Amino acid sequence: KEYKLIWHDCDSFDELKGKDLQQSYGVCFYKDKLVIVSNNGKWSLVGGHIEKGETPEEALTREVQEETNMKVLKQIPIGYQEVINPDGTTIYQLRSFCLVEPLGEFVSDPAGSVTEIKLIDPKDYKKYFNWGKIGDRIMERAIEIPKIVI
């Protein structure tokens, strides 16, 4: 048995109320650059696990500060990944567009595994991570948002 991943575009996470929300990750932009983090030697977006009692927005705000020492100025839902586990249970992994700004110098998170951050041209993301069609859709949505909203 395998994991089944289904991507859903959305502009709000309201439809997921009461569901098993596991992750909140942001496609974070500082000015026109994409913020990525090196986590255990692998580059990825900023984010992580939603703690008990946290909203997805609170979790992402906390993760952004812990991993990058940046502040979230704006958060807009992009969509979510529905993950159907081999045992038939389903969890949800949320993705949002974020505008961020540094609070100060980057300091490696002592409690975490992020050792480096980079600001890259968003079009170059595949040089750092490639998540197939779902990853392409996440990035496509995130890159479009500033043209619409900002």
Which residue ranges define each predicted feature?
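Acidic, metal-coordinating catalytic segment for phosphate/diphosphate chemistry
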Residues: 1-25
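Class I (Rossmann-like) S-adenosyl-L-methionine-dependent methyltransferase catalytic domain
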Residues: 12-15, 82-84, 145, 150
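Nudix hydrolase/Nudix homology domain
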Residues: 111-150
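Active-site-adjacent beta-strand/loop module that shapes the phosphate/pyrophosphate-binding cleft
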Residues: 81-105, 118
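A short coil-to-beta-strand element that immediately follows conserved catalytic motifs
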Residues: 71-79
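Conserved Nudix-box catalytic region and its N-terminal flanking loop in Nudix hydrolases
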Residues: 29-67
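Conserved hydrophobic "DFG−1" position in protein kinase catalytic cores
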Residues: 26-28, 119
